[in-house]
Amino acid sequence: AFGNVEKMSENIEITPDYYDLDQIYERVDGLEKSSGGRAQVFVIGRSIEDREIKAVRISKNNSDADLPEILLAGTHHAREWISYEVPLSIAEFIVENMDSNPYVSDILERSVIWLVPVLNPDGYVYSRDQERYWRYNRRINPDMTVGVDLNRNYDSSWMQVEYVHGTGPFSEPETVAIRDLMKNSFEKPFENGIKSLDGLITYHSYGQMILYPPGSTNDPAEKSEYYNELASKMAELTFSECGSVYLVMQTSVLYLTFGEMT
């Protein structure tokens, strides 16, 4: 599939402007309207301030239970505005070209694409309206500080650091929304009942790096060679398209992280 992704990437454009949340969701809803139902929009949860968290499922049809399922997730961190734009622009390109572009068509013949462009809607709104470099959600913590880092609130090697990682794994409605999406929406069950996700990319800025797990230990992952090969190919394609050099490394080489989504 690398060749098809390479061909598809030649035509994706990123808008120079950043949209407010209502405009982002108008674009998300527009995917369903313009795709003949092949892009489906779901509200997978609500934020701490009761804003919708939306997901999009793009497929050739609605009965592709045996296909690999890939999730692209953006805006864990409020201030990283480009992280919603990349997956959303990818989704728009796929929908616009699913019938006319053979490379896009082939990808959808072999996979189902899920997207959550804005996992942290409250933080995103706050970063636009109040504090540009705000990172967290808008949880009022027991010590009256504000905000939990959503990408430290998963159950993968979770570690409490005051309240910035939450009071426990999945203490935040935003991460619960992703967890429940994985439990309830992906088609193929694991042995433990959790649904099978075949690939996951989370988008962040800044840094020009492609990181792969694990982040909580310096020991290599069981599939570290595969992860490195995949990440290196992504970096190669990025360089060939725009001349930007992206570093490839295991997350923990940069620094140790606990409770990350990946």
Which residues does each predicted region cover?
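Extreme N-terminal flexible tails
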Residues: 1-12
